[in-house]
Amino acid sequence: MQEALNADAAEVEADAGCPNEPIDLDDVVRDAEDAAKQAESFKGAPGVVVISRYPAAGLREVNVSLDSDDITVKSADGTDVVIEWEAGCEGVEQPTVTLEEHTLSVRRANPDVFKTFFSVFQKEGGKVTVRVPRGYAADYVLSTTSGDIRLYAIDVDKVKVNTTSGDVRVEPDAGIRAKEIDVTTISGGATVSACAGDVVVSTVSGKQFVSCDANRADLNVVSGKIHAEGASEEWEISSVSGDAEVLCTVAPTRKIQINSMSANVHVALPGDIRGFVADISSMSGKIVNEFGPNRYGTCALPIHMDTMSGKLMLTRL
């Protein structure tokens, strides 16, 4: 029996082209393990891939919830909602896409809690791009920990954006048409441009730049700064210690409401404003009103500005 086995082994060695070198099974196993590791290292390698494509008809909501990945939503030709993925580095797991009850969801199947926590301090994720048909309106819920979020020229009913340290940008190229935009970030910045509807932006230490002709602009900050401009019908600004500047290119039609603890707040009104009724108060801060009296002109636009120790300025644009 042993002679037969030796003969078979000799035939194998001869077929392998190395009759004088015996086969080392340990080497074969090691080679297989190395090949497996090498293949695993290519998972998530850089490069854009389409991971999902769904007909837009019937979809009511797109929900993207990731950790350190960047999220971009933009309009495109066609009738499908297309999800693209680009890995930021080797070994990054590709997110999964599911469809349930008219909601398209993009997330990782088994998020790593440890990685999620430390992703606040580092950027190792990839990039998810959602391409939606032009004129297609739905609700969008976008959230990430340290990734940036971008929105380009899309039609939406409502969009809710949340990030911890990432920046949020509603790009000004064509703006977005939305009934409601809600942006929340802690230390990241928020830039919202060329949009209408109701706009709500809340940051803790991040800076805000808002330039839009909104139905209502509600801007909230703790220690970050606010720069806002446009022809919004209603402005509501709330700040603890972060300074705020509001440049009204067109006189609001409803109201201006400013509440501050110690922040300096500057509101500039257009020179052709027909009038207003102002209630400006500060416990220890300075008040500057270039228009003179608290009642100006014939229009009764209500302006309320209140602070404890900050400086309040009402000037002409």
Q: Model features per residue range: what roles?
A:
Residues A4-N6, D15-R107, K123-S143, D148-N162, ...:
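Short linear S-[DN]-x-LW-Φ motif typified by the pepsin-like aspartic protease active-site region
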Residues G88, E100-H102, A109-P111, G135, ...:
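Solvent-exposed coil/turn segments that connect beta secondary-structure elements
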Residues V159, T164-S165, A178-D182, S187:
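Non-catalytic C-terminal interaction regions
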